[in-house]
UniProtKB/Swiss-Prot annotation:
Record's GO cellular component terms: cytosol
Keyword Cytoplasm among UniProt keywords: yes
Species of origin: Salmonella typhimurium (strain LT2 / SGSC1412 / ATCC 700720)
Pathway named in the protein's UniProt entry: Cofactor biosynthesis; thiamine diphosphate biosynthesis
Protein name: tRNA sulfurtransferase
Length: 482
C-alpha cells in the first residue's frame, strides 16, 4: 500500500532552506509514529510530498488514521501506483478502478501531471472522462459538484490511481518550533490550548497543579496522555505534577478573600516558570479566555503576567466557551473535561475583577514563599509514556453515605469563610469543622475511634480528600451526601 502525504500550504511558501527543514522534520515525525505499526514501513520525502509505503495490508486503516493526526499534514492520498504506456492505458486502468464506484453517479475527472508527456492534463481529463461516460451507461459527467471526483496523478511513466483522500489536521510539524509548558487542569480550555500549540509545531510538556489528591491527578494524567498519544507521540514529553494544596492552604489563611484568585494564579505562574527554566522551556501555555472568569480580565491577566519573565501564550484568549467546547469535541477531550471535578473552597466568593498591584503585593507579603519553593522542588516529573501504566493502578474506593450511625461524626471541610457564612447543622449528629487544606496535617489529631463523614457543598472535594486519607492509611473515613 502507498500513501502520498501533502504538505500544509504554509510550509510550501517558506524559503527553500526552511521548507526543506520542515519536510525533514515531518518525515522523521511520521517515521516515529508509524514504526510501531510496521517496522518495514518506508517513508520517503520529496520536494512537494512525502511517500509512505508499507507491506502489511492489515495495518492499512490504523496507518491511515495515524497519518490524519500528525501535525504538518494537509491531506493524505491513498493510491495505487502502476506503470502506463499512453492515454488509453490510463483510461483502461481508471475504468477498472472506478467502474463500480461510478455506477448511477455523476462524476468528473481531475488530473495532476508532472514530467514530460505528449499530452496535457486537460487532454487526459477529457479522454478518460469521455471513455468512462461511454463505458458506464448509468454514469453521467457533471463538472460542478459531482457525486464522485476521479482523481488521477501522472508522474513520468507512473500513474497514481487515487483510492481515497483523507484530511489531516494541518499546522506545522512538531519540533519546528520551540518547546512549551502547558498548565493543564483537565478541563475544556487547557486541553484545547495544548492541542493548538502542538498543531502549531511545538512540543508540549504538561504541568499540573494538584488541588485534590490522587484521583484528580490520575484524571488529568489521562487527558495529557490522550493528547500526547493522539497528536504528539512523535516526541517524548514530560508530565510534571506539583502538589499545590499547601500553597492553597497558605493563601486561604493569609490572603484577603477578594484577592485570592489572582494571587493563586500568580503563584501558579511563578511555579510553572521555575519548572520551565529547569527544563529549558521557552513559554507557558494556558487556556485563559478574556472575561471568562474574574481572574481573566485584562487588568488581572497583566498582573498575573508580571510575576515572571517567561512568555505566556494564551491561544484561546478571544474564544467563547461554545467554540472551545466544540473544539474539545473535535479532538476528543470533551468527555474527559465533562467528568473532571470542580473544587469547592478554592476560589474566593467575591473575587476582584480589577486587582490593584500594590494591594496584591501587600497581600503576598504575608505569604510564606518557602512553601512555594518546597512544592516546586518536590514536583513529580514523569515521562508521559509511563503514564498509561501508572494510571491503570486502581484508586482506593471510598464509601458514600446519606445517613449516619451512633459512632459517626460529620467533618465539614469547607474553607473557614464558607463555614462562617453557612454553618452546617445536622440534627442527631456532631459536626466538626476542619478546612480541607488542613486535613493532611491535622486529621491524625482527631479521635480515630470515630468514623468521620467528610462533607462539602458539591461533594467533590470531600470525596477526593477522603480518597487521600484512605491512601494515607485512615480507614475510618466516608463521604457524606444527604
Amino acid at each position: 500500500m502507498k500513501f502520498i502525504i501533502k504538505l500544509f500550504p504554509e510550509i510550501t511558501i517558506k524559503s527553500q532552506s526552511v521548507r526543506l527543514r520542515f519536510i525533514k522534520i515531518l518525515t522523521g515525525n511520521i517515521r516515529n509514529v508509524l514504526k510501531h505499526y510496521d517496522e518495514t514501513l518506508a517513508v520517503v520525502r520529496h520536494w512537494d510530498n512525502i511517500e509512505v509505503r508499507a507491506k502489511d495490508e492489515n495495518q492499512r486503516l490504523v496507518i491511515r488514521d495515524a497519518l490524519t493526526r500528525i501535525p504538518g499534514i494537509h491531506h493524505i492520498l491513498e493510491v495505487e501506483d502502476v506503470p502506463f504506456t499512453d492515454m488509453h492505458d490510463i483510461f483502461e486502468k481508471a475504468l477498472a478502478q472506478y467502474r463500480e464506484q461510478l455506477e448511477g453517479k455523476t462524476f468528473c475527472v481531475r488530473v495532476k501531471r508532472r514530467g514530460k508527456h505528449e499530452f496535457s492534463s486537460i487532454e487526459v481529463e477529457r479522454y478518460v472522462g469521455g471513455g468512462l461516460n461511454q463505458h458506464i451507461e448509468s454514469a453521467r459527467v457533471k463538472l460542478t459538484n459531482p457525486d464522485v471526483t476521479v482523481h488521477l496523478e501522472v508522474e513520468d511513466d507512473r500513474l497514481l490511481l487515487i483510492k481515497g483522500r483523507y484530511e489531516g489536521i494541518g499546522g506545522f510539524p512538531i519540533g519546528t518550533q520551540e518547546d512549551v509548558l502547558s498548565l493543564i487542569s483537565g478541563g475544556f480550555d487547557s486541553g484545547v490550548s495544548s492541542y493548538m500549540l502542538m498543531r502549531r509545531g511545538c512540543r508540549v510538556h504538561y504541568c499540573f497543579f494538584n488541588l485534590g489528591g490522587a484521583a484528580h491527578e490520575i484524571g488529568v494524567r489521562q487527558v495529557a496522555h490522550y493528547l500526547w498519544n493522539r497528536f504528539g507521540s512523535s516526541h517524548r514529553v514530560r508530565f510534571v505534577a506539583i502538589n499545590f494544596e499547601p500553597v492553597v492552604g497558605e493563601i486561604l489563611e493569609k490572603v484577603d478573600d477578594g484577592q485570592m484568585g489572582v494571587v493563586l494564579k500568580r503563584m501558579m505562574v511563578r511555579a510553572a516558570s521555575k519548572v520551565a527554566e529547569r527544563y529549558g522551556v521557552q513559554a507557558l501555555v494556558t487556556g485563559e479566555a478574556l472575561g471568562q472568569v474574574s481572574s481573566q480580565t485584562l487588568t488581572n491577566l497583566r498582573l498575573i503576567d508580571n510575576v515572571s519573565d517567561t512568555l505566556i501564550l494564551r491561544p484561546l484568549i478571544s474564544y467563547d466557551k461554545e467554540h472551545i467546547i466544540n473544539l474539545a469535541r473535535q479532538i476528543g477531550t470533551e468527555d474527559f473535561a465533562r467528568t473532571m471535578p470542580e473544587y469547592c473552597g478554592v476560589i474566593s466568593k467575591s473575587p476582584t475583577v480589577k486587582a490593584i498591584k500594590a494591594k496584591i503585593e501587600a497581600e503576598e507579603e504575608n505569604f510564606d514563599f518557602s512553601i512555594l519553593d518546597k512544592v516546586v522542588e518536590e514536583a513529580n516529573n514523569v515521562d508521559i509514556r509511563e503514564i498509561a501504566q501508572q494510571t491503570q493502578q486502581e484508586v482506593v474506593e471510598v464509601e458514600t453515605v446519606s445517613g449516619f450511625g451512633p459512632n459517626d461524626v460529620i467533618l465539614d471541610i469547607r474553607s473557614v469563610d464558607e463555614q462562617d457564612d453557612k454553618p452546617l447543622k445536622v440534627e442527631g449528629v456532631d459536626v466538626v469543622s476542619l478546612p480541607f487544606y488542613k486535613l493532611s496535617t491535622k486529621f491524625g489529631d482527631l479521635d480515630q475511634s470515630k468514623t468521620w463523614l467528610l462533607w462539602c457543598e458539591r461533594g467533590v472535594m470531600s470525596r477526593l480528600q477522603a480518597l487521600y486519607l484512605r491512601e494515607q492509611g485512615f480507614a475510618n473515613v466516608k463521604v457524606y451526601r444527604p
